A protein has these predicted regions:
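Active-site-adjacent structural elements in enzyme catalytic cores
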Residues: 1-178
Length: 178
């Protein structure tokens, strides 16, 4: 997503830009999304496919779970290729600033735009919607340094030591070498 200065005659509603003087523009890589945008012939302003404050969906089923009957149609073109939010780059400054890391890396941006800065993640005033710390907060309890795992929990582990033979475990590195 590119954060750009909003022109005075910009036809996009201020509501779609959260009342900001900037506008965030996204051009999806997905061929189906590009075909829809091309057929529309005009810019499309749309919210995220998840309820505010929830983790971004990566499959159509996640959108259905999050939004339910609030939407009439969901276009299922398979799972997202990258399970992250979009990279957000503020292009209103002399040096572009990566406001939120995502599927496009700073190195990829630098290969096109030259030098970029990276935000510390705490803007005084968000430059685009979706930039609040709580916007993508998971709605789940997290326990750190757990010494046991309950039946309804999943375990994210590291190293050879296992707490149990539970079914929901993801080991980041069995050799403890990332």
């Amino acid at each position: 997503s590119l954060v750009l200065r909003r022109k005075s005659d910009c036809p996009v509603s201020h509501l779609a830009a959260a009342g900001l003087e900037t506008i965030a523009v996204r051009v999806p890589a997905n061929a189906t999304a590009q075909a829809i945008l091309g057929a529309a012939g005009v810019p499309i302003a749309a919210p995220s496919a998840n309820a505010s404050g929830k983790i971004s969906p990566t499959e159509a089923a996640h959108v259905q779970e999050s939004l339910g009957d609030a939407v009439d149609r969901i276009i299922d073109d398979g799972p997202c290729l990258v399970g992250l939010e979009s990279t957000v780059v503020d292009c209103t400054l002399k040096t572009p600033v990566v406001l939120r890391p995502g599927g496009v890396t700073s190195e990829q941006i630098e290969s096109i735009a030259g030098s970029v800065a990276v935000s510390d993640g705490s803007p005084n005033k968000p430059a685009s919607p979706g930039m609040l710390q709580s916007h993508y907060a998971p709605d789940a309890a997290i326990r750190l340094n757990a010494t046991s795992v309950d039946v309804e929990e999943a375990l994210l582990s590291f190293g050879a030591h296992r707490l149990s033979d539970i079914g929901m475990e993801r080991n980041l590195s069995p050799t403890a070498n990332l």
